[in-house]
């Protein structure tokens, strides 16, 4: 994949996702329930008023997809919905060694969600998809790859 832009901070992630998905009508996020679900809700926030249908699939549980809706408390998971979409956003927690999602089973589910045609976006930290070898298996259209630095201060 070739680099097309750089940015920093949380705004860099959110703005990139909003720009990449301008033409998307229905977006399904796929990630782990604990680690990735809050990121899906966060990434969905900037497109809350864009008229897009949003869903979240935990791990490989296609049949238990949840709608993501805007509420007075921000973006939240809601009732079950159809996972079919024109855009899939895969979240990096799936590639973490402790999670060990079978990438080939994930690829099959992505094909099922997209119905054979659509856009695949990866959103990850510290190049986890590349390090896990997923670039060779999943045909990402875009990758939002960010690094974090942590500073802890004490009085």
Give a label for each model feature.
Residues 1-24:
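Short N-terminal or domain-adjacent regulatory/targeting segments
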Residues 39-98:
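Long, charge-dense
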Residues 10, 29-41, 93-98, 125-130:
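Gly/Ser/Thr-rich loops at beta-strand to alpha-helix junctions
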Residues 26, 53, 119:
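Residues at the starts of beta-strands that form the adenosine-phosphate
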Residues 26-31, 88:
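Short hydrophobic beta-strand segments
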Residues 80-155:
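Glycine-rich, aromatic-bearing surface loops/beta-hairpins
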Residues 34-53, 129-133, 138-142:
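Domain-start "cap" segments at the beginnings of catalytic or binding domains
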């Amino acid at each position: 994949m070739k680099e097309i832009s750089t940015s920093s901070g949380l705004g860099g992630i959110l703005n990139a996702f909003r720009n990449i998905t301008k033409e998307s009508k229905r977006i399904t996020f796929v990630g782990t329930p604990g680690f990735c679900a809050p990121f899906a809700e966060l990434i969905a926030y900037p497109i809350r008023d864009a008229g897009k249908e949003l869903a979240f699939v935990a791990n490989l549980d296609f049949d238990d997809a949840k709608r993501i809706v805007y509420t007075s408390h921000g973006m939240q998971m809601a009732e079950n919905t159809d996972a079919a979409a024109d855009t899939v956003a895969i979240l990096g927690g799936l590639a973490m060694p402790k999670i060990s999602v079978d990438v080939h089973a994930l690829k099959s589910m992505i094909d099922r969600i997209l119905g054979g045609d659509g856009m695949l976006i990866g959103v990850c930290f510290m190049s986890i998809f590349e390090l896990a070898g997923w670039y060779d298996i999943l045909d990402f259209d875009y990758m939002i790859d960010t690094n974090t630095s942590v500073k802890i201060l004490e009085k």
